[in-house]
Amino acid sequence: MLGAADIARRAVLAAIAASANGRLVAMASRSPERAGAMLAPYPDARVIESYEALLADPKVDVIYNPLPNHLHKEWTIRALEAGKHVLCEKPFAMNAVEAEEMASAAKASGKHLMEAFMYRFHPAMRAFVEQLRDPIHVEASFGFTAKDPSDIRLQAPFGGGALLDVGSYAVSVSRWILGEPGEIFARARIERDIDMTTSGLLMFDGDRTASVWASLESPGAENLTVVAAGGVHRRERPFTAHRDPQDPYQLMVESFGDSVLNDRPVAIPPAESIANMRTLDRIREASRS
């Protein structure tokens, strides 16, 4: 575990510990006290006081990277070059250029690299997508209120903003269902050089469309609606339905572990993450033009 991120405390530590094919070995943090508190329920795991020492540890096979967005590329590449497989938290990078550099590093190292889009591993979500017949329109929304001014999601240098944080989910699921978009229209409300709210209209071949909406200044909103030949399909909490009853984080960890142990392709290949970042880049550009 690279860093003592809150997502580790809330979901990923338990998922690794419960996985059938993985073991929680160590957490590196520049705040050893915080890391120690997080690892208290996992007495076999060690606190390591530098990221470099974690990457050099021969007992570590896989790095989970939940660092702030602007550090994804640097530390993912450093981990790959150190001979570690990497599960990198979403969004994969700051932009498509960074994503391509990460993918190139993975190829050069011969190690596995996957973006941690856990929602794609939830059995109910997979069943929802697989039962769709001839989808023609997707509406995906994800928003909440970021109240703490010190929240890194509100800091432009750290890759803050609604589009990268929660819009990455809306874009990912739209592309999962409809494929790659053509023309894109978008608008954003900018404050302190970050998008507090972004909305976009994505055009696909065959006159199919997707409406995506992401916000850091709204009441909780998380919905997915798909218009298809068989009718209108809706799913609430498509991105955060944890442990009901299966834990998508654990399923994601086990899937990545299977790829590592058996040298199988990862479920979400780097090419998919590059394509998602490319669409996010295009939405950002369209929203500010």
Where does each model-flagged region fall?
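Hydrophobic residues in well-ordered beta-strands that form the structural core
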Residues: 8, 49, 88, 113-115
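Rossmann-fold dehydrogenase core element
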Residues: 100-118, 134-140
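C-terminal helix-rich "cap/oligomerization" subdomain common to oxidoreductases
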Residues: 62, 205, 255-289
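N-terminal Rossmann-like dinucleotide-binding module
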Residues: 1-42, 289
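Predominantly a Rossmann-like dinucleotide-binding segment in NAD(P)-dependent oxidoreductases
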Residues: 119-185
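A short helix->loop->beta-strand "cap" motif at the edges of active sites that frequently abuts
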Residues: 45, 82-84, 109-112, 207-208
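Beta-loop-alpha module in the N-terminal Rossmann-like domain of NAD(P)-dependent dehydrogenases
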Residues: 33, 42-102
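Contiguous beta-strand/loop segments that form the cofactor/metal-binding neighborhood of enzyme cores
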Residues: 171-239, 254-260, 264
